Amino acid sequence: NHTDKDRQTDDFYATEPKAAKLLLGLETFSPNIWECACGDGSLSKVFENAGYNVKSTDLIYRGYGEGGVDFLKTQDRWDGDIITNPPYKFAKEFVEKAIETVTEGHKVAMFLKLQFMEGKARKNLFLKYPPRTIYVSSSRLLCAKNAGFDKMIEGGGSAVAYGWFLWVNGYNGKTELQWFN
C-alpha cells in the first residue's frame, strides 16, 4: 500500500521493458502503435526495436517522445493499436478513451494492477467494454517510481501483481483469462 505522500506526484511509474517483450509473445499488433503515456520510453523502445511504428506521447516530457500531450483531451481517431501503462489514478479514463480512439478491430493493451478488476465503476466499464483477454503475470513484473528500477530490485522487488488487459474495439464477447511469465 502507498500513502499519498509516497506516490509520485504525476503518477510516473516506469514499466519494466520485459513486460512489453512478453506482451509481444502473446499478441500480434498493428504496424502502428501509440504509446500515450510513454514516460521515459521504456515500452516504446521495445516496440520500436521489434519493428513497429510508434507514436510516443505524454503529458509530462521525461526525455522521450512528445511532451505536453494530454491523451484524455485528444480528439483524433487512431488507425492502429494503443499500448500503455496509464497513470493508475486515471486508468479507467485511459481505457475508455483508448477504446473510443482506436478504429474498429484495433487493440488496446493496458498494463494494470490486477486489482483493476475490482470496483463498481470498473464493473460497469467491463460490462460496456469487455476485455477480450486478461493476461495475468504469474511472476512479478516491476513498475518503478521515477524509473528507479535498481532501488526497487535492491528493496526486494514488488508486492504488486500486474497483467496486460487487452480490448479489441467492437468486441462484445466473454473475457478470457490467461497466465504468462
Predicted features and spans:
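Class I S-adenosyl-L-methionine-dependent methyltransferase catalytic core
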Residues: 1-181
